[in-house]
Regions:
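Bacterial Sec-dependent N-terminal signal peptides
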Residues: 1-28
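Sec-dependent signal peptide cleavage junction
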Residues: 18-58, 63
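Helix-rich interaction surfaces within compact, conserved domain-sized segments
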Residues: 30, 120-190
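Surface-exposed, interaction-prone regions used to assemble/regulate multi-protein complexes
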Residues: 56-67, 183-189
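Mid-length scaffold segments of soluble, non-membrane domains
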Residues: 77-130, 135-136
């Protein structure tokens, strides 16, 4: 009798564990499919942003909204994307830097805004699909070469400004958008 009760208890416990494992396996499958669907949606969104950025580069009407700025000797600072940007529209290039400082600066926002005519515009795509986009800027307060580097599959971009008369290069890291979709505030230019 005791053996029969013990066998029934083991059978009930074993059956319960088996059902729990089946439910756990079902949850794992659901989580895996959910994770895969989420990853596919994120990848599709990034590819759509990349396609818009490539089209904006081809039309020469774009804005790089920077969230991080890196100075000559590697010092970097996180900044606002609405006040730190590099843009090109109608043959005019604008470079604006506005750090989070107390001093207002020449542009009224804690930095400097320079504008000039863009020339010698070149675009190259390497075998991996990464894009390098360069142009020269000449204007009041700026004489420089600007080089953009955008990785395939994303609109994340890095623009480096190389001045012609000194070595105080500066890099802007952020996302590249078509000019019409950008959300930037332009300060006073020099």
């Amino acid at each position: 009798m005791k053996q029969l009760i013990l066998a029934l208890m083991l059978l009930l416990i074993g059956g319960g564990i088996g059902m729990t494992q089946a439910q756990t396996t079902g949850k794992k499958v659901d989580k895996k499919t959910e994770k895969a669907a989420k990853k596919a949606a994120e990848e599709a969104e990034l590819n759509a942003k990349y396609a818009l950025a490539v089209k904006a580069l081809e039309q020469q009407e774009f804005v790089l909204e920077a969230t991080r700025v890196e100075f000559k000797r590697g010092r970097s600072e996180y900044v606002s994307s609405t006040t730190n940007f590099v843009s090109l529209k109608d043959g005019k290039a604008t470079v604006q830097l506005a750090t989070n400082s107390v001093i207002s600066g020449p542009n009224g926002m804690g930095g400097i805004t320079v504008e000039g005519n863009a020339s010698h515009i070149e675009s190259k795509t390497d075998k991996k699909g990464n894009i390098t986009y360069e142009f020269q800027v000449q204007g009041t307060g700026i004489s420089a070469r600007v080089s953009f580097r955008m990785t395939k599959g994303t609109n994340r971009c890095r623009a480096t400004v190389y001045p012609n008369f000194n070595s105080n290069m500066i890099s802007f890291d952020g996302e590249l958008y078509p000019y019409a979709q950008s959300n930037v505030f332009k300060g006073r230019t020099l």
